[in-house]
Curated annotation (Swiss-Prot):
Induction: Induced by salt stress (0.5 M NaCl) under control of rre1 and hik34. Transcription induced by 0.5 M NaCl, 0.5 M sorbitol, heat shock (45 degrees Celsius) and benzyl alcohol (a membrane fluidifier) but not H(2)O(2) or high-light treatment; the induction kinetics are not all the same. Response to all stresses is mediated (in part) by two-component system rre1 and hik34. Expressed at a low constitutive level, protein levels increase 2 hours after sorbitol exposure and 8 hours after NaCl exposure (at protein level). Protein levels do not change upon heat shock (followed for 24 hours). The lineage of its organism: Bacteria, Bacillati, Cyanobacteriota, Cyanophyceae, Synechococcales. This is Aldehyde reductase AdhA. One of its GO terms (molecular function) is zinc ion binding. It comes from Synechocystis sp. (strain ATCC 27184 / PCC 6803 / Kazusa). Zn(2+) 1 binds at residues 36, 39, 61, 148.
Length: 336
């Protein structure tokens, strides 16, 4: 039996929950969980904000742990290996996206917390292809958020062929944005942070931003007209997108990684005349995750985390929901 924590209904508190996972599949890995990040997507699933939640719901998709068991078809990890698991717990492996290496775009990809019990427990299972071995030297306590927040901002840097000479702005310096700033600085880019938090300004500079602009001040935003080659938006609220797009240089690219549920209100003419573009992306493939982890270790990039024990799980969730979390929250089974 696997001991976990589950929401039994929308907006419900998490409760102890046991389930029998059945026989381990030939292509499955069972992970003994050491740490698991708490992401805003977990909150959305607990509260059924996206209308895709099934209860009992065991959240948790930023898993770090050791391989406890594996099926006979798994050969890239061994029992005892340190591994991580992110948003996806499996892929079809036969569609064009999978065969092209874009597993994260697989139309039938299995989510770790949608119709599947996630990592808020002592163990979790997933298809082997979605389980990524951790590189030596990585900090285990802070590695979990890299499997969602980290790859969410790193993947478009790879897919958009971001040049190290680019001028890049990040909207929102929270769980995603503080990682984007670190990755972009290490990539070689000139980084500007749009933030509404006066208290974060010194810290954002320490994380690697070259410039800061007040996102609550339209004049400050407008002062950057035509400046940026890329903008990465990490926020989940509606903003004046046309004002931000005015800060793109010709052929500039605006990329969404934060989930904004409201329809976008965009003026086409500035996009057309400046050959500017708008796009979005979800997480990344296992191969890109592995590349990101190596890059993070090489450049000493770490999520800033606050740690709670698993028996404080509802306290941790309330802390994140309140907006008081210092970037990322991680649950721990560690005795330390």
């Amino acid at each position: 039996m696997i001991k976990a924590y589950a929401a039994l209904e929308a907006n419900g508190k998490l409760q102890p929950f046991e389930y029998d996972p059945g026989a381990l599949g030939a292509n499955e890995v069972e992970i003994e969980v050491q740490y698991c990040g708490v992401c805003h997507s977990d909150l959305s699933m607990i509260n059924n904000e996206w209308g895709i939640s099934n209860y009992p719901l065991v959240p948790g998709h930023e898993v770090v742990g050791t391989v406890a068991a594996m099926g006979e078809g798994v050969n890239h990890v061994e029992v005892g290996d340190l591994v991580g698991l992110g948003w996806h717990s499996g892929y079809c492996m036969t569609c064009h996206s999978c065969l092209s290496g874009y597993h994260n775009l697989c139309a039938t990809a299995e989510s770790t917390i949608v119709g599947h019990y996630g990592g808020f427990g002592d163990r979790v299972r997933a298809k082997g292809v979605s389980v990524v071995k951790l590189p030596k030297g990585i900090d285990l306590a802070s590695a979990g958020p890299l499997f969602c927040g980290g790859i969410t901002v790193f993947s478009p840097m790879v897919e958009l062929s971001l040049k190290p000479t680019a001028k890049v702005a990040v909207i929102g310096i929270g769980g995603l944005g503080h990682l984007a700033v670190q990755f972009l600085r290490a990539w070689g880019c000139e980084v500007t942070a749009f933030t509404s938090s006066a208290r974060k300004q010194t810290e954002v500079l320490e994380l690697g931003a070259h410039h800061i602009l007040d996102s609550t001040n339209p004049e400050a935003i407008a002062s950057a007209e035509g400046k940026f080659d890329y903008i990465i938006s990490t926020v989940n609220l509606k903003l004046d997108w046309n004002l931000y797009i005015s800060t793109l240089a010709p052929q500039g690219h605006f990329h969404f990684v934060g989930v904004v549920l409201e329809p976008l209100d965009l003026n086409l003419f500035p996009l057309l005349m400046g050959q500017r573009s708008v796009s979005a992306s979800p997480v990344g493939s296992p191969a890109t995750i592995a590349t990101m982890l190596d890059f993070a270790v090489r450049h000493d990039i770490k999520p800033v985390v606050e740690q709670f024990s698993f028996d404080q799980i509802n306290e941790a969730i309330a802390h994140l929901e309140s907006g008081k979390a210092h970037y990322r929250v991680v649950l721990s089974h560690s005795k330390n």
